[in-house]
């Protein structure tokens, strides 16, 4: 059983907004392993940028649960069937969200921007429930200017473009997490640092293996652009920001050269419908292989100030454009 409502001061719900969820008219369902199930539509009036809570009662939970640990959000767990309750004073706080794959809002904004990628989009370093990811700051900026546009974040920490990591590769999930989102008009793709980093972490590389990886990444980005254009979605690329200060990847000169080579390719005209040069925005001019101190968290991820800078640099006029379906 499940219900949806607007979240009040946590962990409470706005009782007046509590609505039951059904699945093909039934309150209960069985979801097969690795499958997903959409609920029937439900009418609920929500203010812009409201928090939405989904209550789930599991009669029998799976041995291994689906979870987005890097959601930068909290969940609350209680024993028994409490889907009709609006408060749970005895709830146990859990980091991340569990079992829930998406919430689809059937509004009709002029622009729907889906931002996807790895932990930088996922918001590494952002305190839970604080909404300080770069996409959160961009959403507030759009709202403050009265823009008829919304932002959807489908980043997954540890994600890679080509191969599965902490979740499926972006190439594999691009349809589900970007192109299939309701009303999507634009998408931002910021990914590749884990592809480069994992390729050399704890292993030897050769000029041939590095060249092969770059060619694979270029082909992967080109395929995303082709798939987006086939659906009339404007694809916005993004350069990879520097990470020489990362203790996790500890990149050497060869890895930095690969990042520079990939960024040069990403910057070439025609690769995307627009480009965000986050490398130029956040790098240290005196040490271009590293992030500037004021926007650096851990040598790999931006700080909260860095996320704000990314949002402030986004060219809002891009969202006024429309991209014709490629034939």
Regions found by a protein language model. Give the residues of each.
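Surface-exposed amphipathic alpha-helices with a cationic face
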Residues: 221-229
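Serine-esterase "nucleophile elbow" of acetyl-processing enzymes
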Residues: 85-157, 162, 166-167, 171-183, ...
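Catalytic His-Asp segment of secreted/periplasmic serine-dependent ester chemistry enzymes
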Residues: 171, 199, 240-327
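N-terminal secretory targeting modules
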Residues: 1-116, 126-129, 320-327
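The substrate-binding groove and active-site-proximal loops of carbohydrate-active enzymes
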Residues: 165-166, 206-215, 248-252, 298-299
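Solvent-exposed loop/turn segments at secondary-structure junctions
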Residues: 61, 119-123, 156-161, 193-197, ...
């Amino acid at each position: 059983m499940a219900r949806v409502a607007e979240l009040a001061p946590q962990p409470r719900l706005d009782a007046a907004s509590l609505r039951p969820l059904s699945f093909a008219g039934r309150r209960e369902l069985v979801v097969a392993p690795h499958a997903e199930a959409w609920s029937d539509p439900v009418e609920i009036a929500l203010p812009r940028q409201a928090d939405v809570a989904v209550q789930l009662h599991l009669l029998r939970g799976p041995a291994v649960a689906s979870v987005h640990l890097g959601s930068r959000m909290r969940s609350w767990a209680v024993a028994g069937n409490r889907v009709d309750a609006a408060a749970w004073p005895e709830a146990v706080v859990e980091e991340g969200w569990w079992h829930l794959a998406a919430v689809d809002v059937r509004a009709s904004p002029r622009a729907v921007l889906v931002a996807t990628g790895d932990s930088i989009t996922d918001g590494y370093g952002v305190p839970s429930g604080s909404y300080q990811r770069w996409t959160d700051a961009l959403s507030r900026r759009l709202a403050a200017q009265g823009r008829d546009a919304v932002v959807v974040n489908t980043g997954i920490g540890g994600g890679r473009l080509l191969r599965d990591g902490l979740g499926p590769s972006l190439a594999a999930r691009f349809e589900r997490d970007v192109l299939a989102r309701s009303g999507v008009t634009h998408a931002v793709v910021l990914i590749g640092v884990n592809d480069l980093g994992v390729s050399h972490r704890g292993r030897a590389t050769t000029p041939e293996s590095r060249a092969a990886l770059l060619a694979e990444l270029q082909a992967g980005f080109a395929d995303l652009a082709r798939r987006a254009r086939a659906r009339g979605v404007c694809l916005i690329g993004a350069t990879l920001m520097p990470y020489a200060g990362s203790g996790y990847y500890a990149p050497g000169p060869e890895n930095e050269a690969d990042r520079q080579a990939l960024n040069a390719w990403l910057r070439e005209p025609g690769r995307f419908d627009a480009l965000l040069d986050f490398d130029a925005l956040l790098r240290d001019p005196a040490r271009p292989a590293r992030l500037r101190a004021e926007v650096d968290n851990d040598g790999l991820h931006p700080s909260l100030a860095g996320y704000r800078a990314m949002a402030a640099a986004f060219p809002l006029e891009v969202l006024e454009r429309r991209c014709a379906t490629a034939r």
